[in-house]
Structure formats: structure tokens, C-alpha cells
């Protein structure tokens, strides 16, 4: 079952990206290195509630 998730920057806490994840394959919160336009650098983004 795929669900929509929002990714937030760990530095500035801005919610920058929306994506889909498969809950069966990824039961935990996902983390990705993505570009944050507010920090103007690549930072770690975590799944939010």
C-alpha cells in the first residue's frame, strides 16, 4: 500500500518535498539527502507525520 509522505529539512524544519512510499517495504520513517532551497544546500530530509 503506497501512501503520500512529506519530507522536512532537519536544519530549518521547512517541509520541502512530497513523495510516495510503500509502507510494506519501508515501515520506518524515510530519510533522504535532498536540496533545501531555504538553506541553499543539500541537507538530510526526514519524513514527517
Swiss-Prot record:
GO biological process: translation
Family: Belongs to the bacterial ribosomal protein bL33 family.
Gene Ontology CC: cytoplasm; ribonucleoprotein complex; ribosome
Gene3D superfamilies: Ribosomal protein L33
Keywords per UniProt: Ribonucleoprotein, Ribosomal protein
Lineage: Bacteria, Bacillati, Bacillota, Clostridia, Eubacteriales
GO MF annotations in UniProt: structural constituent of ribosome
Name of this protein: Large ribosomal subunit protein bL33
Amino acid at each position: 500500500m503506497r501512501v503520500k509522505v512529506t519530507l522536512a529539512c532537519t536544519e530549518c524544519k521547512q517541509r520541502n518535498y512530497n513523495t510516495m512510499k510503500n509502507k510494506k517495504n519501508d515501515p520506518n520513517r524515510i530519510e533522504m539527502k535532498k536540496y533545501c532551497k531555504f538553506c541553499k544546500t543539500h541537507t538530510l530530509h526526514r519524513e514527517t507525520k
